[in-house]
Amino acid sequence: MNVYLIRHDVDNFKFYLQDESDFLSVAAFDFCGESLFNGWKPYKIELFKGKTKAEKSLNGDFNSSCFSPGLLYVEHSLADVLSRQVNNIELLKVITSDDRDFYYANVVGKIPALHYNNRQELQIMSRTQEYKFNNSINEMLIFRDEI
């Protein structure tokens, strides 16, 4: 089984940032595994513009953004694919500063995916980027650990 960690390639692509003063944005960031669908109100995310020449020259042609851990934003075409393939995900509209059609991908529920016996083992896995998984993830296309 191949397991992939979703994160953004910040060295090559632009990305979206959330407004941390926006209550709705903070609620998504403070994920507890619950559904956010009922009562969802789209919040605004800002395209990172950059300050240096290198940052300003980052590629803006991307279909997903995951700058902040746990906040995955996907473009409409990718949202369509995910909605057909994945049962435990909500695709919730967000407002982008550059008027692109993006959604917040809320993975509903948390599972004990990582196999470790103590905090030290968990820290070693994090440092080495070599993870041991429980069998509970065998049939899941996308999941979020309870940590």
List the model feature ranges, each with a label.
Residues 1-147:
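Phosphate/anion-contacting hairpin/loop surfaces
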